[in-house]
Amino acid sequence: MFKKLFGLGSKTNEETIVAPLTGAVKNIEEVPDPVFAGRMMGDGVAIDPTEGVVVSPVDGEIVQLFHTKHAIGIKAKNGTEILIHVGLETVKMEGEGFEAHVSEGQAVKAGDKLISFDLELIREKAKSTITPIVITNTDAAESIKTTVGVAATKGSTEVMKVTMK
């Protein structure tokens, strides 16, 4: 009762996800990959980046950094687990053109630089530069609200609001 009366509790369950990249925000269904478009990895959005920098979309912890540096997992303070997968079929690049600025277990704040990448090299060597940002523990979420069709600025534009159960 007190939680509802004083607005306690609800704030800890809700997480605002800001854009980890600068670019056009798209519906996850627009990703030209059936695994992401079919939400098999989780619900979310995708960004078609205009620059090669990924920043943290939340305050949280780096829980996974792929050795090829093309993807990173972050756990927000409310338990939301976020996967940022730079481009499609970029794993085949074996880390070429990617640089990590964080390591697993590291605490991060929204806007902290996580990965930098060579956008032109990805255009040349991978299927697409489109970058899915998905909530991998979608089943633990009460609601996921997405904002698509906007031009996002990394570290500031809200792209999702996730409320955990």
From Swiss-Prot:
GO terms for cellular component: cytoplasm. InterPro entries: Dup_hybrid_motif (IPR011055), PTS_EIIA_1_perm (IPR001127), PTS_EIIA_component (IPR050890). The record marks 70 as: Important for phospho-donor activity. Zn(2+) binds at residues 70, 85. GO terms for biological process: phosphoenolpyruvate-dependent sugar phosphotransferase system. The modification Phosphohistidine is found at residue 85. The phosphoenolpyruvate-dependent sugar phosphotransferase system (sugar PTS), a major carbohydrate active transport system, catalyzes the phosphorylation of incoming sugar substrates concomitantly with their translocation across the cell membrane. The enzyme II complex composed of PtsG and Crr is involved in glucose transport. This is PTS system glucose-specific EIIA component. It comes from Bacillus cereus (strain ATCC 14579 / DSM 31 / CCUG 7414 / JCM 2152 / NBRC 15305 / NCIMB 9373 / NCTC 2599 / NRRL B-3711). The gene is crr.
